[in-house]
Amino acid sequence: MRGRVFDHQCLWVVRNTITSPDKIDKMLDFALENNFNHLMIQVRGRGEAFYNSEFVPRSSVIFNDLFDPLEYVLKKAHQNNIQVHAWVNMYILWSSVEPPESENHLYYIHPDWIDQKGYNEEKFNQDNDNLEDSNDGEGYYLAPHHQAVAPYLLNVLREIVEKYEVDGLHLDYIRYKDYDFGGNAFALNNYRTQSGDDASIFLSAESTVEEKSKQSASRSLKWNNYRRNSVTELVKKAKEMAMTIRPDCILSAAVKPNLYIARDRFLQEWDVWLASGYLDWVIPMNYTPSFRNFAANIDLIYENFPPKYRERIIMGISTYNQSSSEAVNKINYSKLKQFPGVSIFSYNVLEENPDYYVPIKQALVK
């Protein structure tokens, strides 16, 4: 086997690949043949588990009740010296048009945990009659600032680390859905109790621009920092938990690639997570087909991080929205900028179009 261009050559593997041993074997053959030494295996998507869990409902697309996809991947990958990171979708809960099949899904058990866009006290209740208001295209998200959400998600991560010899935990959707989310009434009431302040003015569609502008900048900053810190605290606690149970476990997160947009729009301060040591790796999803925008996101990283932090940044590159030559240019540029690794999204695209992958394969070997 020829050598790797990067120390860490990672491949995202979407959950529909790990529903049977045959599909997993085919994926692992591909990874081995193509010099990938880290696999990000999606084991929690749409609030469902692709592993044996005591409390997360099992995915309905795994037809063999005796089959444990994560256990099988770990056994086979470790035999070939490939590291496995359990890729966990965090706050996003459901993204299908049809509702979940399992009655044990959080969608049914705790609709009161789901975040809302804007604020309207009347539409919040203990059932899910009005959840369509929170979908808004991408899917339903848990409210990061709801006091019950972080303990639940931490237990999801803890169960994986305790039961499986994973080499890493990979956090995805570790952010707010968007800037105008945060209107979960229960979480807002908790914020009001803790801070003595009312944030509903910033979220209500009935509030005029003039009314919002009258609110002090310090109140707005306080509210935004509170939401931001809700996410950061979960990342911090995840790191503490992983270090206690499995000290060698690599904690990483897939993040918005523009540092400022991540922080200000999605309340995802991954610069803090990296600098504070809450994460071992950060993987910006630098999926833009535009080389100029791709490079601009890297420029922001260079402006904000000295080399000792850039050594822990793995550059995420997409294959679904650009030509293979464009993807190769971004791989080469990531090497030029001295990042220690790349993560390719995703195996599913490459598996469906082998010819597309040939130039990318050549760019990843030396």
Give names to the regions the model predicted.
Residues 28, 45-89, 226-245:
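Aromatic-lined substrate-binding rim segments of carbohydrate-active enzymes
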Residues 9-18, 54-67, 136-154, 219-230, ...:
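The substrate-binding groove and active-site-proximal loops of carbohydrate-active enzymes
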Residues 53-62, 92-133, 173-213:
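Aromatic- and acidic-residue-enriched segments that line the glycan-binding/catalytic groove
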Residues 278-295, 301-304, 308-366:
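Substrate-binding cleft of secreted/luminal carbohydrate-active enzymes
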Residues 83-91, 170-178, 203-206, 216-266, ...:
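Aromatic-lined carbohydrate-recognition surfaces of secreted/lumenal glycan-active proteins
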Residues 4-10, 18, 86, 91-163:
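Active-site-adjacent "subsite" loops/lids of carbohydrate-active enzymes
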Residues 93-96, 170, 179, 244-283, ...:
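Substrate-binding cleft/loops of secretory-pathway carbohydrate-active enzymes
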Residues 23-49, 163-168, 278-281, 337, ...:
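Catalytic domains of carbohydrate-active enzymes, especially glycoside hydrolases
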